[in-house]
Amino acid sequence: MAMTVHCDIVSAEGEIFSGLVEMVIAHGNLGDLGIAPGHAPLITDLKPGPIRLIKQGGEAEVFYISGGFLEVQPNMVKVLADTVQRAADLDEASAQAAVLAAEKALNEKGADFDYGSATARLAEAAAQLRTVQQIRKKFGG
């Protein structure tokens, strides 16, 4: 039996996942992270994108987070996210529409235009779309 670590994924809405996993793969601000049991303690911020959990037996479960923090202790991994969705619940058409709307907002700057907010919306929509496309490519759905 493979070694495991306890993982919690929590958002403002509540706990999304709690259980034993063999590995957590996430997109940190400085690059990708692979967290296995016994990993050195760390805290880092997370970029919008997928978090992949390899559960006992090798089954993978993917979540989309809009950003947040990752805390690693030797026997525990905690993801504190702004918002979390199961990747299977993401809709590619909606994500594509959000990307187009964000790009349009950037191109049509109005009087009350906030560049920082517009680029953040574009980055989040693009991350959702990438997550959906990666899952479709990997699992053929």
UniProtKB/Swiss-Prot annotation:
Matches recorded under Gene3D superfamilies: ATP synthase delta/epsilon subunit, C-terminal domain, F0F1 ATP synthase delta/epsilon subunit, N-terminal
| Bilayer topology term | Peripheral membrane protein
Cellular compartments annotated: Cell inner membrane
| MF terms (GO), sorted A to Z | ATP binding; proton-transporting ATP synthase activity, rotational mechanism
Q: Report whether Phosphoprotein shows up as a keyword of the record.
A: no
Name the CDD domains on file. F1-ATPase_delta
Top-level taxon of the source organism: Bacteria
InterPro entries noted in UniProt: ATP_F1_dsu/esu_C_sf, ATP_synth_F1_dsu/esu, ATP_synth_F1_dsu/esu_N, ATP_synth_F1_esu_C, ATPsynth_dsu/esu_N
Quote the Pfam families the UniProt record gives: ATP-synt_DE (PF00401), ATP-synt_DE_N (PF02823)
Main subcellular location: membrane
* Gene Ontology CC: one annotated term: proton-transporting ATP synthase complex
Instruction: Write out the entry's keywords from A to Z.
Output: ATP synthesis, Cell inner membrane, Cell membrane, CF(1), Hydrogen ion transport, Ion transport, Membrane, Transport
- Tell me the leader sequence span: none
Q: What does this protein do?
A: Produces ATP from ADP in the presence of a proton gradient across the membrane.
HAMAP family from the UniProt entry: ATP_synth_epsil_bac
Q: How does it assemble?
A: F-type ATPases have 2 components, CF(1) - the catalytic core - and CF(0) - the membrane proton channel. CF(1) has five subunits: alpha(3), beta(3), gamma(1), delta(1), epsilon(1). CF(0) has three main subunits: a, b and c.
Name the family the entry cites: Belongs to the ATPase epsilon chain family.
Protein name (database record): ATP synthase epsilon chain
Give the gene symbol. atpC
